[in-house]
């Protein structure tokens, strides 16, 4: 095979590695993806009836405070001035998220000064001193009233489990802002790609030394590749090793898309549904991500209802569950990965951690700098093959959205 590096997966991690190795190191790179499109879960496409850009795998919002990542992304796309804001419905009323001073005033029906709100939440949170489950942990952070309104039902739908039966460690913090700032992210840089995610990702792959093969499963070719050419693998870690140490637990998402005969369904890009008797967790309305696009129809809109559940084998894995059993399996898989000659493991699936897009790019740049560049610079030396898991990873964290 006349290539210097094989990358399994064409998401942000894989394409960043491929682009940097091709453009920065002069390598011939083959990118393989089992799907029929480029871009992993960031893939977007125009809904055919309306032309509205839809994020097929749930809303993806780009944000970062990493200047290097921002500068790198801007090589391939310009960004809009979009700033993400989220609202939640509960018992027929709408509140801004994450919980902020406006949310507190709206929910309790009076005006609070910041110090008054802090004192109120502290008093309500004092109900629980030694949390033994997720419900008690959440109450110890924000108090029972706000927990019952915005966390309990939403969490039960996410995990398909009563929060009293979930471990406390799932939630380590619940941000509360004692200002009226209702921006979802606090990063220095934020926006959406002007031409969409797929155009951005295609530009990353558009290099004469990069070949992309879609509908091609790396695992079908593994025996021919591993040991003969260096590999960066971004697929599921447990699947690479044939689930020999057991399956790593994931949550998955199901989506229900609908074209509606109205120019505006909900007035905002994302609406959470905190009531437990509403089966979906949130609704996306994609036209609101790009209000600057004048070609969107005035009489039609596209919505996507999102449902959360435990992933079974064959489902698309989104969020690591990260139980104690999962962490034990992960350690075993990391040991196997460290002994895998000529293979580096990276990305969300390859390291069993939740990665926002900017985190995936940063991690890929680090792999190129610290593993691949030194390897190929010293490729003439014997026994100098990249291998292993790429170093320890931060603990996965559960999140409420596809890529926030």
Language-model segments: residues:
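Short, well-ordered alpha-helices that flank and scaffold nucleotide-derived cofactor binding pockets
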Residues: 19, 23, 206, 366-369, ...
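Conserved flavin/dinucleotide-binding core of flavoenzymes
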Residues: 46, 284-391, 395-399, 403-404
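Glycine-rich FAD pyrophosphate-binding loop
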Residues: 19-48
């Amino acid at each position: 095979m006349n290539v210097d590096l094989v990358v399994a997966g064409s998401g942000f991690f894989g394409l960043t590695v491929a682009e940097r190795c091709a453009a920065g190191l002069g390598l011939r790179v083959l990118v393989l993806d089992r799907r029929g499109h480029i871009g992993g879960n960031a893939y977007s496409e125009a809904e055919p009836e309306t032309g509205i850009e839809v994020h097929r795998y749930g809303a993806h919002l780009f944000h970062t405070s990493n200047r290097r990542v921002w500068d790198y992304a801007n090589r391939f796309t310009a960004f809009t001035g979009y700033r993400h804001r989220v609202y939640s419905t509960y018992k027929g009323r709408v509140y801004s998220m994450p919980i902020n001073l406006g949310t507190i005033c709206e929910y309790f029906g009076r005006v609070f000064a910041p110090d008054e709100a802090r004192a109120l939440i502290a008093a309500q949170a004092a109900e629980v001193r030694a949390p033994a489950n997720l419900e008690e942990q959440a109450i110890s952070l924000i108090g029972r009233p706000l927990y019952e309104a915005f966390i309990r039902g939403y969490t039960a739908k996410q995990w398909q489990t009563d929060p009293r039966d979930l471990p406390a460690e799932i939630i380590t913090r619940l941000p509360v802002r004692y200002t009226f700032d209702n921006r979802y992210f606090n990063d220095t840089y934020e926006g959406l790609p002007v031409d969409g995610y797929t155009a951005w990702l295609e530009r990353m792959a558009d290099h004469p030394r990069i070949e992309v093969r879609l509908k091609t499963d790396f695992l079908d070719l593994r025996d021919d590749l591993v040991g003969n050419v260096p590999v960066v693998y971004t697929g599921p870690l447990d699947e690479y090793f044939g689930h020999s140490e057991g399956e790593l637990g994931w949550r998955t998402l199901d989506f229900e898309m609908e074209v509606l005969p109205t120019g505006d369904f909900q007035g905002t890009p994302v609406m959470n549904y905190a009531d437990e008797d509403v089966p979906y967790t949130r609704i996306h309305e994609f036209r609101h991500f790009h209000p600057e696009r004048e070609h969107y129809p005035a009489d039609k809109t596209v919505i996507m209802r999102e449902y959360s559940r435990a992933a079974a084998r064959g489902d698309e894995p989104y969020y690591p569950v990260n139980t104690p059993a999962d962490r034990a399996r992960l350690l075993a898989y990391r040991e196997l990965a460290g002994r895998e000659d000529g293979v580096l493991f990276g990305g969300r699936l390859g390291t069993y951690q939740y990665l926002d897009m900017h985190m995936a790019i940063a991690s890929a740049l680090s792999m190129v700098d610290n593993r691949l560049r030194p390897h190929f610079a010293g490729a003439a030396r014997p026994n100098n093959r990249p291998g292993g898991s790429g170093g320890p990873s931060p603990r996965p964290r559960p999140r409420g959205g596809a890529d926030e």
